[in-house]
C-alpha cells in the first residue's frame, strides 16, 4: 500500500482555502493573514507511506506453508542479524522494519487460517469429571474426601495421638 499526500504550497492544493480529501481523511486549508501585511502564509506538508513488504514469505525466507514455529524461528534469526543494536550497516533499520512488517503479515494470515479451521464442541456440564456429592460415581468423591469426614458424621476413624 502506498499513500502520498501534499498539502498547501504549489503542490496538490495550490490555492489557499481550497479543500480536498484523501482515502481516509479530509483536510481544509485556510488563509492566514498577518496583521498589517497582505502576505499569505502558505505551508507545504508532504507525507508518504509505503509498505515495502512485497512478498512477506520471501522477506522472511520461508515457504508459504510454513508453520507458526518455523515463522517465529526465521523471524528471530533475521531479527538477530538486522537489529539496529547489532547491525552496523546503513540500511539495517529499514531492513529490520521490513522484517517486522513481514512477520506481522504472515502471523495474521496463519491466525486467520487457524480460526477458520477450529471446531468448537458445546460445553456439557454433566460431562465434567468431578461434580462433588452430585457425581453419579460418588465412590470416587468419598474415597478422595472421606478421610476428612465428607458425607459422614462419624469421626471415630481419626486418631489423635496427643489427646
From Swiss-Prot:
Pfam families: DnaJ. Keywords: Chaperone, Chloroplast, Plastid, Transit peptide. GO terms for cellular component: chloroplast; chloroplast stroma; nucleus. The keyword Lipoprotein does not apply. PROSITE patterns: DNAJ_2. Belongs to the DnaJ family. C/III subfamily. The gene is ATJ8. Plays a continuous role in plant development probably in the structural organization of compartments. It is found in: Plastid, Chloroplast. This is Chaperone protein dnaJ 8, chloroplastic. It comes from Arabidopsis thaliana.
